[in-house]
Amino acid sequence: MAPKAEKKPAEKKPASEKPVEEKSKAEKAPAEKKPKAGKKLPKEAGAGGDKKKKMKKKSVETYKIYIFKVLKQVHPDIGISSKAMGIMNSFINDIFEKLAQEASKLARYNKKPTITSREIQTAVRLVLPGELAKHAVSEGTKAVTKFTSS
């Protein structure tokens, strides 16, 4: 056991000498890289800016693109203001939330763990009035059959 104790202090001495050498190398390295550091600073600042942009940018789900596409299908010559687009987007979010709540209630009433197309269809009939519900159901079934066939 005594030789093991001797090896440890012997290993520690070279280890303590190595950081001194590394410090001197570390001091020399930045001095040599000063001109390059000037070139790297914009890249690093840009990288830091990208990180900030990524942190600020949150994926907000909006329907603005789809609202605009439908508007151009119905009235190609008419535009829409950003305020009106925001109102339409919040309207669609509200309708979808009401449909989801109604569908979840229906699933709970029937003691089912999943919301199927049947619950969504019934929720549409309950939430939307009269003729609008009929059109929504027909368009929904058309979309579901198109999705399942492809």
Swiss-Prot record:
Modified residues (N6,N6-dimethyllysine): K13
Modification type N,N-dimethylalanine: residues: A2
Composition skew (Basic and acidic residues), residue ranges: 1-35
Residues the record lists as N6-acetyllysine modifications: K7, K12, K28, K33, K39, K40
PTM-bearing positions, type N-methylalanine: A2
Regions crossing the membrane: none
Gene Ontology terms for molecular function: DNA binding; protein heterodimerization activity; structural constituent of chromatin
Domain of life: Eukaryota
Processing and modification events after translation: Can be acetylated to form H2BK6ac, H2BK33ac and H2BK34ac. Mono-, di- or trimethylated at the N-terminus to form H2BA1me1/2/3. H2BA1me2 and H2BA1me3 may be methylated and/or acetylated to form H2BA1me2K3me1, H2BA1me2K3me1K6ac, H2BA1me2K6ac and H2BA1me3K6ac.
Cross-link (Glycyl lysine isopeptide (Lys-Gly) (interchain with G-Cter in ubiquitin)): K146
Location(s), subcellular: Nucleus; Chromosome
Pfam families associated with the record: Histone (PF00125)
Predominant cellular place of this UniProt entry's protein: nucleus
Chain residue ranges for the region called Disordered: 1-57
N,N,N-trimethylalanine: residues carrying this PTM: A2
Keyword DNA-binding: yes
Function as written in the Swiss-Prot or TrEMBL entry: Core component of nucleosome. Nucleosomes wrap and compact DNA into chromatin, limiting DNA accessibility to the cellular machineries which require DNA as a template. Histones thereby play a central role in transcription regulation, DNA repair, DNA replication and chromosomal stability. DNA accessibility is regulated via a complex set of post-translational modifications of histones, also called histone code, and nucleosome remodeling.
Subunit (UniProt): The nucleosome is a histone octamer containing two molecules each of H2A, H2B, H3 and H4 assembled in one H3-H4 heterotetramer and two H2A-H2B heterodimers. The octamer wraps approximately 147 bp of DNA.
Family: Belongs to the histone H2B family.
Protein's name according to its UniProt entry: Histone H2B.11
